Amino acid sequence: MVQGVIELVTHPDRKESPMKLSLNIFVSLDGVMQGPGAPQEDTTGGFTRGGWLVPHLDEEFGRIVDEEWFAHADAVLLGRTTFDMMRPYWSAYPNQEELVARVLNTFPKYLVSDTLTDEQAAWGPTTVIRGDVVEQVRAIKQQPGRELQVHGSWQLAQTLHNAGLVDTYRLLVFPVVVGQGKRLFDEHSRPTAFRTVSRTATAGGLTHLVLEPTEFTSGDLTADGTTDLEADGTEVSATVPA
């Protein structure tokens, strides 16, 4: 694929409205998303605490990932590290009819990489994105369909958040502090508030949050029990319950 040009892939089941972009992320209480599934999954930066989600898995985990994540996908967008991690596992997965395997192996995929050739990136229908990622993802979102889903893909997820391109954030939060590793949000993240669409707590202690971004606001909690909120330079007073 030529740099700066997106080859649009048609999926037969797509709806007519433009696709939404969602981030679907496993995250710890301290915001780490690196190497959740295994010690050697992602050791970049000297990360030694991979596999941190495994002790906390429960029966609801699989249902959430299947029914509330992948069931909404019409296309998948991945960074290089996540692509390289997923491809050997899911391409050889024993039951290719399971939902996650079917989506990852047969649905349109977009890979962000300036180094892999199209031949090296061969995994079902995969298009390599090179050059201006933000503008090319913006163009992909104009295709009809349900969701263009990002899974993992730390650097890509941060880039899309900071560009304001993410429509839905699905965060599966695990009750563990990892203490080191790549974080979804850091001191350079675009300030953003969120509307909670839904939240689910599982028996094993997982919390599934579905969030939509809204405008960041700040305020001043005053001594007289009111708070002054400021949004776009406009002050709004509200009473704080005692």
What are these regions (language model features)?
Residues Q3-P18:
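Short, Lys/Arg-enriched N-terminal segments with co-localized hydrophobic residues
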